Amino acid sequence: MKEEETAWTYVFDLDGTLYPIANGYERACRTRVFEFMVKHCPGVETVEEARSVWSGAFRRYNQTLRALRSLGFDGFDEEEYWAYTRSDAKEALAPVESTRAFVESLRGKKYVFTNCHEKQAKEALVALGLSDCFDGVFGAGDMGAVCKPEPAAFDALFSRFDVRDPSRCVFFEDSLKNLRTANRSFDMVTVLIASDTLTEEIDARAASRRPNAAADDDDDDDDDDDPTAFVDAIVRGGELTIESFSRASFKPTERAVEACADALRGASCT
């Protein structure tokens, strides 16, 4: 069998995966979203109103720009939106050698898959000292009308980078919604970076199941006692390093151990 047919491919989310969500940068970006809405969305006059409008729409559309367009807010320039809401990466983010060491330990093609625009994603990677670690970046501009967790966004990623067997891909991500699609639709190896994002999604999921709440079809088959039951591995602490991965909880399969054997060997040598 040819080497390329057995090699693993590694796909990484950006926010909350390649840097800890507790860093505060993602929260600052969200605050700038609310400020942008006050400036550019008619009828939204305060940050509190913006947060309320954003909350329900984001849960449904999974990306702020799509959510705003769906609500009829289209009188602003997309480049201006991304530049304003994702600014200051070089001030907020800094290289973390232990995360770089983890990424470098993996032998195979490596890609970043993010719902933010690829231009701003690349700026963040430069700030993180990771820009030379990846074979490609796939972002909102590349996806067009779709985004994670929609299967069409994954299909577009695979097509762009000629990924022929998604089951030989490992997906590192802090969002259960996105991992769920990777697992159900493509049989990818899924690695959850457990952080505040997980808490937010579980809380939102619980709220959606209260009486009179709209059902969330994506959650219908989840284990009520453990919504993370489907993932292959859970990295706790919100930071992706060789050490944290070596302490990960490997859940239903050992595929994650096989796929990330190089990183685990690195842990045994430290």
Task: State where each predicted segment sits.
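Asp-based, Mg2+/Mn2+-dependent phosphohydrolase catalytic module
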Residues: 1-7, 104, 117-270
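N-terminal helical cap/lid subdomain that shapes the substrate entry/recognition surface
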Residues: 3-97, 117-119
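Generic anion/oxyanion-binding catalytic loop in active/binding sites
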Residues: 22, 88, 110, 142-143, ...
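Active-site phosphate/pyrophosphate-handling residues
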Residues: 66, 101, 152
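Short, well-structured alpha-helical interface segments that form or flank functional binding sites
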Residues: 97-98, 177
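Catalytic-core regions built around general acid/base machinery
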Residues: 98-107
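Proline-centered loop/turn at the N-terminus of a beta-strand
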Residues: 109-111, 189
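Conserved phosphate-coupling serine/threonine residues in phosphotransfer and NTP-handling enzymes
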Residues: 114
